[in-house]
């Protein structure tokens, strides 16, 4: 296979070369328009948007106007922000517009690149979503690029976590909407829980650009978005189960699989658990929940580590994002795992949750007509992007060649030897004033290293989840001469480290609102680094206040420039990795913090055979080699065999994680098909004021099912008419049925069906007439939605339990996924049938009181249930719905009550 690929590469060129050949001619067309755009007045340039929209309305495609639209954005960006898109950014914009992932290195200007495709696609008028990893970046990027969009008459909205319904609706109605993957996903789920179509906030899913696409579509794809409500189950079981875990013996009672992050009970362990709990059979059907909780408690104790996977703060277990190192306050693991951790840490245990709505990021983002993404590191996951999302990765060349020097890994036998070598390296770097960014993969390791540096008298900053509020300040100082910064996972940080430290003078210039000619020229001189000219302009200023402020800015620039030059001489920012991450691209993201925009830089990773990656996935041969070589303590090894073993280990982990994500998707695809049916049915009810045809089809189906169940065949003598009459009485439908009436008919069963169906339909129409058409229409829609939501909630609960226990079929050599599909679809069919029957039964019995009025539509917005992101939860309140006073017959009497959408 490799030989064939090599031959094709020689004949056709590499994929990178082929991709560039397609992009270069279009960039040429854009560049040919630059002179014309420069000569265009502001008013004519801003009117381009209207002209483009008129051309699209006449049938012209977005592709045909791309060169002009991109050239327009480039010129507007230059006029409003002083930033001109490079040719490589044009290539990135084309790749995004075509629905690809643009891989662009750190510092290449992905945010500015996105404006090209965002503007072009916004012209279609269907809304463009720009997806970021956190609220801060969504707001920052929207505000940063807003001058371009404002000039062109394009509206911009930003979704933030604490926004209410009206604010969200306004943001989504804009041409461009910035927000996080979580907010977009949860808004979609909430839109499918509303009681009126006007309560929805999202429009169509037309085009989305996902920033840090690998972080969102790969790293966060293993766990779903869930909206949940609290369960009625007690928390006592978690305390009870937690007490037995310390009594179990490793290897004897259970085996820890670190590769799969799982714990397996042995047969002896099962017997031991049964003995401690005083039960006969742990795997009896009534103990399915017990098995699940024992398993989760074992994982909590043996897999999940404090200060690595979570921290305990103020009596709460708070999750640490494994990819960004940030605390995820308010988020909870699902499936009882968070409660197991709370029991382990002896803090207050919250009640377990019940799923009300859920979707994976894979299935959410696959809904978009066109999807694109940006990142600095996607090529290593190209296969997964192609197979799961049908996205091609286009590698965009850097505007300036990368000058960073990446040195080979240094490998040591023990972690202590590795840390000693790291300490010596940091000392040497600091002595020559070279800033160093030290990357760790956990809070625990960052704190160990911090203590070592403090003991050695080395000043440093620590950036991990515990110091999250100081992130901006720490990153701003990380590029100063001799700065030492320890960071836990730099993925999704979204901030560049500037050599010499942050250019604080730029912020000072922006906040200086004086706009006379001298001040304006002074600002231009500072930005162009023409410091001598800036000094002359200060002397010409007519105000001592202005002179003082300008002098302070100039001094700030001189200090930064000196620091910048010192760092350049020292070799730029040095990246020191203390451990390899499971995924190669996370290592590449850390490396990518250095050498931005042609800056000098360097990187090296320090490893030990005791690192998790090497210990769990590495080869025993490496350890054997080092022992055989009788290496002295502290001696490093640099060898091709070791490097290859590390690469193989990372590929194995990446493959394993891909399988987990694929496995999750296969299970969610079962739910997704069912979700599509339910949401489609729900939307039909929301979109149509009159759903009588749907209800009549339910009535017909209910009648048919009852006749098939009680009156099978064409022999009236064998029919169970008493059961059929009992069902009809339940619907308050008094219908004379005698078997003699049907014996002489050609098709007795069909005749019976036609008679009962006609009577049922007439009863339905009579009720609508007597109650009043307007109230009846509203009533049946509200009742339908109430029952639909209730049945869907119960079905999700059943599916959760099915999935928890489905793995046991593996013991009988059946495929758990196949069984899950079969049983899941059977359960779904039953749920749909129950839904239809319940709607019919309720509508035939409900009565509206004389004094009831048409309910007013409520437009207030409240979050429903709890949001669970990536298996993490957030508590919120229920949404009230319109009320109608009704009377429901029950046996011989009546019961007056208020029909209100049930709180979940």
Swiss-Prot record:
Topology in the lipid bilayer: Peripheral membrane protein
Protein origin, superkingdom: Bacteria
Gene that specifies this protein: secA
PROSITE patterns according to UniProt: SECA, SECA_MOTOR_DEAD
Gene Ontology CC terms, in alphabetical order: cell envelope Sec protein transport complex; cytosol; plasma membrane
PANTHER family xrefs: CHLOROPLAST PROTEIN-TRANSPORTING ATPASE (PTHR30612:SF0), SECA INNER MEMBRANE COMPONENT OF SEC PROTEIN SECRETION SYSTEM (PTHR30612)
SMART domains: SecA_DEAD, SecA_PP_bind
Protein's cellular compartments: Cell inner membrane; Cytoplasm
Gene3D superfamilies: Helical scaffold and wing domains of SecA, P-loop containing nucleotide triphosphate hydrolases, SecA, preprotein cross-linking domain
Protein name: Protein translocase subunit SecA
Record's subunit section: Monomer and homodimer. Part of the essential Sec protein translocation apparatus which comprises SecA, SecYEG and auxiliary proteins SecDF. Other proteins may also be involved.
Region (Disordered) location: 870-904
InterPro entries reported for this sequence: Helicase_ATP-bd, P-loop_NTPase, SecA, SecA_CS, SecA_DEAD, SecA_motor_DEAD, SecA_preprotein_X-link_dom, SecA_SF2_C
